[in-house]
């Protein structure tokens, strides 16, 4: 259940990325403006995606990752192992983590079949540097709506906001990956996880034909 929601959630995480014209100092505006642009692109490029599902990697790389705090999220996943890693190990890990996200997010976008969304009304940001924004995913085939809380973090230097985590039914995506990879980190360290991420990132993206 959690895995399904995490995958569906990426259909909303991806929209966070395309709003070049959006006000990056306001996470609500970025989410609302970018959502429409990304869903329009998914609709428009379906012929190309169906011919080559791995095209979704390019969509993720171009439209999503610039607006996700990849290194911050990756460091949270590592936990204490981040401090123990050498600069070279960190560099290799973040490169592998980025490629992993391209595959994982691309596979999530392959689930697109007409979902819509509702973003919670904007609230005053005040001095907050971490802001959760509730998004409800509505399925056209009558499945129950999925409620997700996206975690946004403000860059104190640039003032820009970026997404770094998502919580579904009280479960954080960061926490889920920490638990999933904890044994590997304990036994093989960051190098072992880096190699696994490289392996996962090579998997082909397959389309979800369920309608």
Over which residues does each language-model region extend?
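Positively charged n-region of N-terminal signal peptides that target proteins for export
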Residues: 1-4
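Low-complexity, intrinsically disordered terminal/linker segments enriched in charged
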Residues: 165-211
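Low-complexity, acidic/polar, glycine-enriched regions of mature
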Residues: 136-138, 151, 194
């Amino acid at each position: 259940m959690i895995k399904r929601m995490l995958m569906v959630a990426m259909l909303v995480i991806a929209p966070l990325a395309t709003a070049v014209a959006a006000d990056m100092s306001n996470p609500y505006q970025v989410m609302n403006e970018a959502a429409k642009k990304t869903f329009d692109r998914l609709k428009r490029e379906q012929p190309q995606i169906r011919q080559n599902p791995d095209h979704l990697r390019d969509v993720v790389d171009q439209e999503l990752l610039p607006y996700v705090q990849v290194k911050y999220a990756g460091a949270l996943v590592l936990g204490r192992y981040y401090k123990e890693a050498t600069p070279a190990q960190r560099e290799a890990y973040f490169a592998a983590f980025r490629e992993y996200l391209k595959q994982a997010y691309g596979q999530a976008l392959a689930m697109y079949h007409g979902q819509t969304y509702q973003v919670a009304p904007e609230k005053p940001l005040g001095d907050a540097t971490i802001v959760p924004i509730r998004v409800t995913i509505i399925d056209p085939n009558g499945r129950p709506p999925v409620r997700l809380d996206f975690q946004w973090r403000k860059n104190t230097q640039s003032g820009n906001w970026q997404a770094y985590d998502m919580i579904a039914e009280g479960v954080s995506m960061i926490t889920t990956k920490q638990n999933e990879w904890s044994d590997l980190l304990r036994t093989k360290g960051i190098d072992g996880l880096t190699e696994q991420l490289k392996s996962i990132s090579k998997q082909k993206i397959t389309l979800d034909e369920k309608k």
